[in-house]
Every structure is written in C-alpha cells, then in structure tokens.
Regions:
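A cross-family phosphate/adenosyl-ligand binding-site feature
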Residues: 2-3, 13-82
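Short glycine-rich anion-binding loops that position phosphate/pyrophosphate groups of nucleotides
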Residues: 9, 38, 67-68, 91-94, ...
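Hydrophobic/aromatic ligand-binding patch that stacks against planar heteroaromatic rings
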Residues: 22, 108-112
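Glycine/threonine-rich flexible loop motifs
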Residues: 94-103
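Glycine-rich phosphate/pyrophosphate-binding loops
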Residues: 113-136
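Electrostatically charged, flexible surface regions
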Residues: 134-233
Length: 233
C-alpha cells in the first residue's frame, strides 16, 4: 500500500508527522509532498502562471512552494507517483461543515479524487488551552484508516474525518460516527477601527460558537466523537 501524504499546515507540522506515524504503523510505503510553508484556509487554489519550486528533502519527502492542491498535482503529474491513497492532514483545527470549502486540507483530498485516487482529509478540532496528544492521535488515525480502507467509496467521493479534542493522556478511541456536514453557516463578525483615511475590519467570530446542527459533523465532533463524512465532488 502506497500513501501520498500532504497537508496545509506545512511539511514540518506535527500533524503531518502524526499522519506519517499512522501510515507507517500500517506498513504502508509513505511519500510526502507537502507545502514548504503554511497554507491554511487557501481553499482549492492552484498555481498555473508561475513555476512551482520543489525541494527534495529526503528520499520520499518533497517540499513545494505552493498550495496543498498544487502538491497533489506535482506528485501525480510531475513526480509521476502512483499512490493507492492520498491522505491530507492531520490539520490543526477542525474542517467541518462550511470549512470544507475554505480548507486547503480538504482541497488536497478533493484534487486527488478528481484524478481517480482514493482520498481522505483528516483534521483535529482544537479547544483553546488544551494541547494535542499527537502520539495518541497517530494511534487513533491508524484505527480509522483501517476502517476506511475496508469500506468501498462511491465514485467521485472522498472521506472527511474530524477528531474531537480531549485532554492528553490514556483514552480509548472515541466513537466513530458517520454524519453529514453541517449546513448552517459559520458565524461572521468584525470589529472596525480607523486606519488613516481607511477602516480596518478585524474578524472577531469565535469558531467554538458556530451553530451545531443536530446530527451533523459539528455536533458530533464538538460532542467528543469522531465525525466521519463522505463529501462528493
């Protein structure tokens, strides 16, 4: 089994290291093609009018001066890799509901799906002030990936997985819940302040205060369980 890994937090992010550990625990061959710098909330942006700089940092590890979707394109069509799966993450922050259209993490998995490669986006919801137990998350991810591999994915669909945030320490794998993405929009609010002849608007909405549709991925993840959704192209 060959896993192509990418993310939007950057090639040196701890979430990508945790995803690498999870893949290796499954005995998979791992190739990493990830952004050289953080690309959070870049959506499905791709680069077509300027060259993409790619630095090979190790035998199977490439840093791309581009977006997550760029990384998948480079892997498939420049490096000519033939992965069985593209796994994107593990994002530091949830990608739930409306987030999936903003997320570079999800965009990478979506790009792979467009080209006929099985794909999953994996993210970890964050509660402020609580550290992430990355070693535990790697173990959980291994279990979840085993499940996803065993299940047939409809054509033109990808997996979106969101882990809940629990305090570090021993904890069994939370319940895995199949659910639909929330349809309610994120809360949006700004605070204004003068800036010479212009006005600055600072985003002030709090992610944790977003609407939680009953039975949705938001309700599931915020409630402490693992939200697993199928997204369609």
């Amino acid at each position: 089994m060959h896993f192509l890994l990418t993310n939007d937090d950057g090639i040196d992010a701890p979430g990508l290291a945790a995803l690498t550990a999870a893949g290796r625990a499954m005995g998979a061959r791992i190739t990493i093609v990830a952004p050289a710098t953080e690309q959070s909330m870049c959506g499905h942006r791709v680069t077509t009018h300027s060259p993409l700089r790619v630095e090979q940092r190790d035998a199977d590890r490439y840093a791309v001066q581009g977006t997550p979707a760029d990384c998948v394109r480079i892997a498939l069509f420049a490096l000519h890799l033939k992965p069985d799966w593209v796994l994107s993450g593990i994002n530091q922050g949830g990608n739930l509901g409306q987030d999936t259209f903003i997320s570079g993490t999800v965009a990478a998995a979506r790009e792979a799906t467009y080209h006929g490669v099985k794909a999953a986006a994996l993210s970890h919801y964050i509660k402020g002030g609580i550290p992430i137990d990355w070693e535990r998350l790697a173990r959980w991810t291994t279990e979840v990936l085993h499940d996803l591999q065993a299940e047939a994915v409809p054509e033109a669909h990808l997996w979106n997985v969101n882990f809940p945030h629990h305090p570090p320490g021993p904890l069994a794998l939370p319940t895995r819940v199949r659910c639909q993405p929330a349809r309610s929009p994120l809360k949006v609010s700004y605070q204004s302040e003068a800036d010479g002849d212009a006005v600055l608007y600072r985003y002030t909405a709090r992610y944790a205060e977003r609407p939680s549709d009953a039975g949705s991925d938001v309700a599931t993840c915020f409630g402490g369980d693992i939200a697993i959704s199928q997204l369609s192209l």
